[in-house]
Structures are given as structure tokens and as C-alpha cells.
Amino acid sequence: MRFDASQPLPEAYRGAIIALGNFDGFHLGHQAVARAAVDWARAEGRPAIIATFDPHPVRYFKPDALPFRLTTLDQREELFAQAGADAMLVFAFDDALASTTATEFVHDLLVARLGAAGVVTGEDFTFGKARGGNVGVLADLGATENLRVRAIGPVLLGGEVVSSSLIRDALSSEIIVPSNPANTFLESAG
């Protein structure tokens, strides 16, 4: 199930725990955030939603940058479902979202429009106009809105933080990892 974040969620999905991030590539770090959100939602009998941005904010701010998308929305929707999410939520990254302050993002979107009960992000998550919000700001704003916030630390592989940038760099360098021909950075959600 896919929802557009510009619209209110159906009543059955309000009160969800939302994993929030770009989730391009859905690597081990992304999976840790998703798993925490799904586990939290299941423990409380709530829907689990994984939210993503399209286009990627970098693509919005630098439209002429080389292609770097690791997964399409359709692929992410399938991966999110395999991870246990009840739905995928897509924030259209456009002029309106780019000009939304951190406070507006939390109050107007996460709380008022989507009715989120909790949000899980990575520790490095930033949001809002000019990246005005981070996990600390999200937690502070959430506390005033009865929105609970959890942050998940980085996942290390071979001593390096697993990230979409690391994967893109490996792909652009044509690095092959013979010990794991399937994909060093991805893990089956099943």
C-alpha cells in the first residue's frame, strides 16, 4: 500500500509508527531503522509505515547531478513490505516541502496531517528548510506534540558506516566484493 504524504492518511493508518528517511538502496542501516519502527509498532498494536522522499532531496537541489538513485519507488515499496511495513508513505520533495520549516514539518505534516504516534530515524537525519531540524530538534518538537521519537545509530560493516553514499561510491568505482556476490550492503528482510 502506498500513500501520498500530501494527503491525510486513512483513519486505519493514523497513530502509526513511521520510519522516516530517504531509504534509497534500503541497506543495512536503513533496515535497522525500519526494523525498529516495525517492532515498535507491533509491540503497541499500531500500523508500521516507512516514509521516503521522492525525488531524493539532493536531486531536487542539484537536478543536473549525475544519476545516483539506487532504488525506484516501486522497488522500495516491495522492500518495505518485505521488512514488515503495512504501508509506504511518499513525501514529494518539491518547492513546498523544501520551504517547510522543521516546526511545520513536525506539527503540520507528521502530527496534524498524518497523525503519527512515533517516528524512528537514523541519528544523522536532518529535515526542514535549510536542514533546520535534526534528531534533537525532532525529539524536542515531538515532546510538545505528544510525538515520540527514537533514533537508531549507524550500522558498521568492515569498520565503515554503511550508507547510500558508500554504496554509490563502490558502484561508481566498480568495486566488486567477491565474498558476497549478492550485495554486501543489503540483507534479506525475509
Predicted regions located by residue number:
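Nucleotidyltransferase catalytic core that binds NTPs
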Residues: 1-190
